[in-house]
Amino acid sequence: PMNAFMVWSCGERRKLAQQNPSMQNTEISKQLGYRWKSLTEAEKRPFFQEAQRLKTL
């Protein structure tokens, strides 16, 4: 099952790739990691909840 970061990064990866078409996948992954770490617990909460929901399916 996907964890909270994976749930969040699915949509974010797409946006980041569209905004930076020449950026390589490894750099996109690094940027996603930095951005995830900068989110507050409140901003992350919906993604933890969705990951938990997916886990129970």
UniProtKB/Swiss-Prot annotation:
Domain of life (superkingdom): Eukaryota
Stored PROSITE patterns: HMG_BOX_2
Annotated Gene Ontology cellular component terms: cytoplasm; nuclear speck; nucleus
GO BP field: cell differentiation; sex differentiation
Keyword Repeat: no
Record feature DNA-binding region, as residue ranges: 1-57
Record-stated family: Belongs to the SRY family.
Subunit structure, as described in the record: Interacts with CALM, EP300, HDAC3, KPNB1, ZNF208 isoform KRAB-O, PARP1, SLC9A3R2 and WT1. The interaction with EP300 modulates its DNA-binding activity. The interaction with KPNB1 is sensitive to dissociation by Ran in the GTP-bound form. Interaction with PARP1 impaired its DNA-binding activity.
Protein's job: Transcriptional regulator that controls a genetic switch in male development. It is necessary and sufficient for initiating male sex determination by directing the development of supporting cell precursors (pre-Sertoli cells) as Sertoli rather than granulosa cells. Involved in different aspects of gene regulation including promoter activation or repression. Binds to the DNA consensus sequence 5'-[AT]AACAA[AT]-3'. SRY HMG box recognizes DNA by partial intercalation in the minor groove and promotes DNA bending. Also involved in pre-mRNA splicing.
Protein name: Sex-determining region Y protein
